[in-house]
Amino acid sequence: MQDDDPELQKAVAAITQGDFELSFAIVSRLARADVALAQHFLGWHFHKGIGTDQDDSQAVHWWLKAARQGVVEAQQGLGWAYANGRGVEEDPVEAYRWFNRAASGGDEAAREGLLETAQRLSPEQLRSLEQES
């Protein structure tokens, strides 16, 4: 799915117009059809509680699906979730991994998260993670 996908544009327009439930319904349908960008947006809906109840564990579930398909914003979201223990157990090593993937994809917020997370890791952990890259 591309950013110019008509269904995705319809979901974005619904957000802009304040119709959060419609946006949630559209991205839910597309996400369940394994559309990566919609999976990221569905994670965002759950994370923010927009058009649905706030649920960080569901946000992580959908971000993980999108991240595995290369959506860097979802990778950054996972880094944030692991760094802060939101929807998953706090894990700075896993946060670093996801921030690193997103930063490699050009996500600026992930670069900041990567630097902040690196400060929470031991030199041994950093060396090990750098060898993974």
Where are each of the predicted segments found?
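TPR-adjacent "capping" and linker segments in tetratricopeptide-repeat scaffold/adaptor proteins
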Residues: 1-6, 29, 124
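Short helix-capping/linker turns of helical repeat alpha-solenoids
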Residues: 2-3, 18-19, 32-35, 48-50, ...
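TPR/TPR-like alpha-solenoid signature
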Residues: 8, 40, 61, 76, ...
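Terminal, low-structured helical/coil segments at or just beyond the last alpha-helical repeat
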Residues: 109-133
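Hydrophobic face of amphipathic alpha-helices that form TPR/SEL1-like repeat modules
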Residues: 5-10, 41-48, 52, 77-84, ...
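Short, hydrophobic/proline-enriched secondary-structure or compact coil segments at domain edges
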Residues: 92-100
